[in-house]
Design a protein with these regions (language model features):
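Mixed-charge, low-complexity intrinsically disordered regions
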Residues: 1-82
Length: 82
């Protein structure tokens, strides 16, 4: 699975930017199958905070649903940070 970096800015494939605040455990997961959740904050508007399953945050863009999108991943680290 892709590495998501706390403190980095990521660009969503639809163009908005978000800062990863933390990666936490999902309270609904149990035992050896603890799921991770990414907490991230919008870098626009009211800077709202959001939570998304780690695997969804790190997932590929659905190229069948969004054939016009050139970005490979749903969220990609903004190169300005690198």
């Amino acid at each position: 699975m892709r590495n998501i970096n706390i403190g980095s800015i990521y660009r969503h494939f639809k163009g908005k930017e978000y800062k990863v605040i933390d990666i936490v455990n999902d309270c609904e997961s149990v035992g050896d199958d603890i799921k991770k959740v990414v907490i991230y904050q919008a870098m626009y508007g009211n800077n709202e905070k959001w939570a998304r399953k780690y695997e969804d945050f790190a997932s590929l863009v659905d190229s069948e649903k969004y054939p016009e999108v050139s970005q490979k991943y749903r969220f990609e680290e903004y190169e300005h940070n690198l």
